[in-house]
Design a protein with these regions (language model features):
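Conserved donor-nucleotide/metal-binding helix-loop-beta segment in metal-dependent transferases, i.e.
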Residues: 178-212
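A glycosyltransferase accessory/donor-loop signature
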Residues: 3-6, 10-81, 87, 98, ...
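The conserved acidic donor/metal-binding loop of glycosyltransferases
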Residues: 171-175
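Short, flexible, basic/aromatic active-site loop/helix in glycosyltransferases
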Residues: 215-229
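Short, acidic, metal-binding catalytic loop of nucleotide-sugar glycosyltransferases
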Residues: 91-99
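Short aromatic/hydrophobic "clamp" motif used to bind/position activated sugar donors
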Residues: 167
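Short, charged, surface-exposed secondary-structure boundary motifs
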Residues: 134-140, 199-206, 305-306, 321-324
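Active-site-proximal specificity loops/subdomain of glycosyltransferases
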Residues: 114-115, 119-160
Length: 365
């Protein structure tokens, strides 16, 4: 392709994108929202704190830049979540236009080709050793490598690896659709607080739970005292932290001791009997119980209130890149597909390779 051909190619790709993903009014509306044209005026649902002026989310650090602030994602256990990490980086760079540094952590199981692809999106790709605890709380026959290795996320606290004032961790299955840079202004550590829905098949769902964005989380909310008395906890899919090498080393030492010495005294509300199911998440809940700051749930939305959401999270179940066949059937899926197409405009070979190798599929395998 010549330089003269490139604008036409981009224009054609943009037209295909619009044709494919603007078939429904809701999708067009959400697409406009990505450009900042959607007003938060027609709230439906209970995700938004009615006492919070959404203009607060426009406040960002005066010194925001790649030297002091960073976003990070994590890819471990092979390359199954590579499309998610690629889209997180693409969305942060080209949809919400952050000027913070982008760093992706990978372990040694991630192939060099995947690392190279990430290196074209992120400012830095860092290979980190996998971290595992002395015990996870799972029955051994139910323990999957995906959850066993999630303590690897603790590397984001390592100031030697992250020499920044603040680092924002974004899960590979969390899609930023509006700017997250405001989170760097919050006291660290910060996370969305979850609470129990006894009618749900899962223990935790997002609610405000009486805490306010940017305010300290009452430690009692994070206390779990028995099998029947489960209050709430943090969601580890979006974390804003201040790296601290000494604290990081202390955490590493702690997870090498039996969980009975430091873990909570409950079993999660799962029929399977899983105890401490999201291990690193609950470890951090205990570690910083007196220190957490609340993040508004719209930054880590369960895709229930899309017009007000800043981030969409596919927590449990099928991931968007595993079932992308007809994006127009779902607004949230269409938004993820739009981010994938944005990545394609910049790096078509990366998308083509992932699709050819079955990492991005039209339907579940």
């Amino acid at each position: 392709m010549t330089d003269a051909d490139e604008p036409n190619a981009v224009d054609s790709a943009a037209k295909r994108l619009l044709t494919r993903f603007t078939e429904q009014t809701a999708i067009r509306r959400l697409a406009r929202g990505l450009a900042g044209e959607l007003l938060l005026a027609d709230h439906e649902g209970d995700i938004v704190d009615p006492n919070l002026d959404p203009r607060v989310f426009t406040r960002v650090p005066a010194d925001l830049g790649p030297d002091r602030y960073a976003y990070t994602a994590l890819l471990i256990g092979g390359e199954g979540y590579l499309p998610g990490c690629l889209v997180v980086g693409a969305a942060l760079r080209w949809h919400v236009h952050t000027c913070a540094a982008l760093v992706c952590m990978v372990d040694d199981s991630v192939p060099q080709g995947a690392r190279d692809a990430l290196g074209r999106i992120y400012d830095r790709v860092s290979v980190v050793p996998r971290l595992r605890a002395h015990d996870s709380g799972y029955p051994t026959d139910m323990l999957s490598d995906a959850y066993r290795d999630m303590y690897t996320k603790l590397h984001l606290f390592d100031a030697a690896l992250f020499p920044y004032e603040r680092v924002c961790f974004v899960d590979a299955d969390l899609l930023p659709i509006r700017c997250f840079d405001h989170l760097f202004t919050l006291p660290a550590p910060a996370a969305v607080i979850e609470s129990v829905d006894p009618t749900s098949q899962y223990a935790y769902v997002h609610h405000m739970h009486g805490v306010r964005h940017g305010k300290p989380v009452p430690p009692a909310i994070l206390e779990v005292t028995s099998d029947e008395d489960v209050t709430g906890g943090i969601n580890g899919g979006l974390l804003m932290v201040a790296p601290d090498r000494a604290r990081f080393e202390d955490m590493l030492a702690r997870i090498q001791r039996p969980m009975s010495e430091w873990g909570p005294r409950h079993r999660q509300l799962y029929d399977s009997g899983i105890r401490y199911g999201f291990a690193e998440q609950h470890f951090l809940q205990v570690e910083f119980q007196q220190e957490w700051t609340a993040i508004d749930p719209r930054f880590n939305s369960m895709r229930t209130d899309l017009p007000h959401s800043f981030g969409l999270h596919w927590t449990i179940g099928r991931k968007p890149w595993q079932n992308l066949g007809n994006p127009a059937r779902s607004v949230s899926l269409a938004l993820w597909a739009m981010a994938w197409e944005t990545l394609r405009l910049h790096h078509p070979d990366i998308c083509a390779d992932a699709e050819q190798r079955g990492l991005v599929r039209d339907k579940p395998s």
